[in-house]
């Protein structure tokens, strides 16, 4: 067996992508539906099925309350931070424990980590199908501006999915890695502008001789393509109410229809000046059914979303300032994320940096490609690349007077370790409470609490005498570890920051076991679907051959074939795999016998009956059904050579 691969996964808000190094080059892997991107959507059906990706998206309108999309906007966050998101989703978001978040469905309650794990399992299976071997290791990307809790939650999702997360890397950094992979001899300063489905990041990097050094990063984890969709949705709801007097925002299935229509309109307005939004039978009143029929122009869309586009300006300016650079110092601006296709976004980028953005990378795939390259570095497949990332936010502790004392400043290269000695604030103080903070504000209360722990057993002494050394250690994943040590006694207390919205080790282990059981059920379900498709293909072929053969076969043979087709269809309805396999063997024999007889008499259709063994065709049928209604467009973003920009 070949050496185990470390795959790269872009776990996106809207879509996810998986890539792997093959023969020294990164390869984006198609999923079982034949698409290179997989919707980050999980659904639970009335039949007890768990659907992931395009299958989940296809049934979202009729099963809105049990279809979870944009889980990434909730991962690692506290319930009080999610009020805006909760207003615009079709499913129910509830409190978990003290401050955590869960999604309530007919199949039970699930954390954002568990939902994300289902998507990661789909990515894992996609890679295993392609490689023909088991995959257990991955590099997973996160927005650069994700805080410690969000990073830890993403890593937990990977564990639940059965993956050993070798590294968490920032999405803009991964994009830069992909862009510069074949430009190792080029020395340049680049800006990566990443506007995805739920988050915005801007990173400034310096590329020199295979070293990718992040100089600064900034962003907004509450801004992305979902917000542009919401702006259109709110406009549709308001316009419809003005026209009819009816508020259509209360019905969950209607909200799901509005969401899909808004997303479609947004995409169309990237290539046309106006779009028609038509939703028949959107609601009804005493006078009868009502239809939504509106025209949205690009000018109106730009007006609705101007504040969202403008929100990306200040992070860009801050990132340039933190890097000690002017816009004119930037050699290339790389655009990442589906939302960068919006013309107003591209125009703003041009205004900020004073140059046309570089469009030589695929904005949907470039992050996963960079993750695969980093996986290649960790696996020893790539040797001439060094990645130096940074921590996006400052870290410190609360000190006397409620002030935040910073130990590690934002944009410090990671991994890093920093210690500082503190003392007691009162005479004979026997314990100190360490309040760990992340943020940029001066007062502790204005920053984010990552955790608290106590160092006890300090010998009685006047205030200011004990020496308490506090050490912050940020690993290569950007995850924080903190320790406090009494230098007088040697007593030490260490913690890995575990958020109030996070998961305990016991909870993670339980979820891992649940996910393993879920994977087994998924495999069984997939085998049943494949058996159905194969048997249905055989039944259809036999039926077609008999109809075309006419009097080339006798009445008894026709009746035998008709009975066998009926038994096959009954087996398909039963969902019993063993019964379907038995029917498949029986119908294959009859099809072969009839085909031989018809062929010997030169009748049409014989070759089809004889050759329809089923498995490949059945798999294709399954894939096609999964792609039903989906517009998979790989070429809507022009890829050009650098010299042809």
Curated annotation (Swiss-Prot):
Q: One Pfam family, short name please?
A: HSP70
Show the GO MF annotations: ATP binding; ATP-dependent protein folding chaperone; unfolded protein binding
Q: Known PROSITE patterns for this protein? A: HSP70_1, HSP70_2
Q: List the CDD domains hit by this protein, alphabetically.
A: ASKHA_NBD_HSP70_DnaK-like (cd10234)
Sites where Phosphothreonine occurs are at 199
Q: Which stretches does UniProt call biased (Low complexity)?
A: 616-629
Q: Which InterPro entries match?
A: ATPase_NBD (IPR043129), Chaperone_DnaK (IPR012725), Heat_shock_70_CS (IPR018181), HSP70_C_sf (IPR029048), HSP70_peptide-bd_sf (IPR029047), Hsp_70_fam (IPR013126)
The protein's superkingdom reads Bacteria
What are the inducing conditions?
By stress conditions e.g. heat shock.
Sorted alphabetically, the keyword list is:
ATP-binding, Chaperone, Nucleotide-binding, Phosphoprotein, Stress response
Locate the region Disordered: 602-645
Q: Provide the function of this protein.
A: Acts as a chaperone.
Family matches, as HAMAP family = DnaK
Q: PANTHER family in the record, alphabetically? A: HEAT SHOCK PROTEIN 70KDA
What family does the Swiss-Prot or TrEMBL record give for this protein?
A: Belongs to the heat shock protein 70 family.
What this protein is called in its record is Chaperone protein DnaK
Please name the source species. Leptospira borgpetersenii serovar Hardjo-bovis (strain JB197)
- What is the phylogenetic placement of the source species in the record? Bacteria, Pseudomonadati, Spirochaetota, Spirochaetia, Leptospirales
